[in-house]
């Protein structure tokens, strides 16, 4: 018996819609986005369980097996993100990103040079540090040197958001959606190379047009001294080795990549242990200073784990749990199958990118992955691209955009970003045309 036309189906759909309305208005009602979706996701499975108990074997009683498979998938992604976030927090605590910011501020560049510098650094930082971190870092730089100049700050912020999302689209580690596609085995590590040119085009078209409106002149050079703390370079090496280990587990050993990432967390744990026992002591001795246990902020890996953004991780859990329930009930097969059958793969995957600017791209990508679609590699590349860069169309369409809005709410608003939406859409279309050209050999 199908659950689609039962009270479980209707109630689950209603609860999912309510949860998403609360998520959309997170900033207005000051309710963390993880709270409604975690509750709703678990309630949906509660109702499914009650329904199966009431009807005995009529539905097959497969919820237990389905949830076990779902949790294995969620758990792998959860631990992967936990390690990545811990590394980013550790690098931040060691002043790696702050040192980069200080270096940029000291260069005394003109507004136009800063526009291109922040955009370029964001684009190439996103594949490693993720699009949210890179957008936050570069937007603080742009704001610091902007001197309140709205004509510079708004296009610079828009450029950073577009560059962050475009940069994250061509790497398994750049965005949660690309990570999901990669761990699902739909696009392998080296196959992401096909998305480099489309991602560059997606960023460069709006960046070039916006650069024509950047005011001439040069902001006052800021003298900010910020040195990296002891252990920063070792941690950066560990981060690179961790990514290599995660890729190797997935690509060559055919084991879940989160195991490689957890192995990398072990690298970081032993590095921090070394710094705690000997590194800081050597550093202070070199400076001719005495060690003061009360004053020294010792390298402690568990402090960085505590600082992980658990709201994001729990939101991720809630979304995947809720979408998994919709899949089990049968909604995804009907909605997804009908949409793709009616429009075709290319049109559907292009539309999904636009839709992801309105609704969070994580549930959209998870839904696509669970629709049992028989798409070839070129189409999986397209939906990976569009789901990653489509959020740039609106300021609230991506985590990077929402975070950057918090840097300067007075100037960078929803409407300020919307004014540049036609230009961003040109980049979106340009990236799809580029995708079509670079993947011709795959068809």
Residue ranges of model-derived segments:
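Hydrophobic transmembrane alpha-helices of multi-pass solute/ion transporters
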Residues: 13-86, 99-103, 107, 262-321, ...
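Structural signature of hydrophobic alpha-helical transmembrane segments
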Residues: 3-15, 72-83, 126-135, 195-206, ...
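C-terminal transmembrane helix pair
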Residues: 193-199, 347-443
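Membrane-embedded alpha-helical segments and adjacent helix-loop junctions characteristic
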Residues: 58-154, 306-374
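Membrane-core helix-loop-helix motifs of multi-pass transport proteins
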Residues: 148-240, 244-252, 403-434
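Hydrophobic core segments of alpha-helical transmembrane domains in multi-pass membrane transport
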Residues: 12-24, 40-49, 81-89, 121-123, ...
